[in-house]
Amino acid sequence: MQAIILAAGEGVRLRPYTQLIPKPLMTINGIPLLTFHIDKLNSLGITNEKIIVVVSHLKEEIVGFLNRFHRGVRVVMQGEKKGTAAAVSYAKNLIDDNEIVIVYGDTIFEDNLKDFIREENAIGAYEVEDVSRFGKIVVENGYLKEIKEKTETGRGFIFAGLVKTKKEFLEELDKVKQNEKSGEYYLTDAIMSFNQKHPFKIYALKGRWFDIGKEESLIEARRVFNFPDNFFK
């Protein structure tokens, strides 16, 4: 099993913090987000040599950090094409194993993912009070039916930036069309395309989850996470 961590975002909404520090190296109670994800994957039996990190913004800082603290992790530079689908596509040539895990590097969560990685084809979901910031996942009989745009409001499940799937999924990336509004290529479009042939099971994350995209989320995550010694076990 291999893993891809998406760590190429500029962190625009976290400026001025991210002007000098890349978002994946922002710390939660002293632990960089990137370390959190690598340690979590290691605890699942995915070694550093099986982990690929996609970088762009302040890439030299991330590469230096990995060389110092997480030797063996491979790094891929995201090119001109932007967005999460594009990021994964730049890493796909390094995928040899049939099973893959894709992780959005600007999230943090309590679930140990041991049940998640046992699934053949699943996406992580998290229930929130207001889905309007994220876009809503429509669930039918435990499986993904639809991922709606950010026009929905109210309580519901959102995509938590976690995918467990097979290598075949990577073939969908070249089919993703550029979003007219943002100019980016979204992984959720590839998920919905693959879902037509291989339905994704919805895995509801246990415990707390944060998208570290705004200052208030960063502050709240730092308040609630204290990382006990057995956190990654």
Where are the predicted features?
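Active-site metal-binding loops of divalent metal-dependent hydrolases
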Residues: 10, 106-107
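Conserved donor-nucleotide/metal-binding helix-loop-beta segment in metal-dependent transferases, i.e.
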Residues: 111-134
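Short alpha-helix within the catalytic core of nucleotide-sugar-dependent glycosyltransferases
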Residues: 38-39, 59, 89, 110-119, ...
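Catalytic-core segments of class I nucleotidyltransferases/pyrophosphorylases
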Residues: 143-211, 215-233
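A structural signal for short hydrophobic beta-strand segments in well-ordered beta-sheet cores
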Residues: 25, 137-139, 202
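A short, conserved beta-strand element in the Rossmann-like catalytic core
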Residues: 107-110, 209
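N-terminal nucleotide-binding beta1-loop-alpha1 segment
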Residues: 1-19, 199
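Conserved N-terminal catalytic core of the sugar/cofactor nucleotidyltransferase
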Residues: 2-5, 13, 27, 31-104, ...
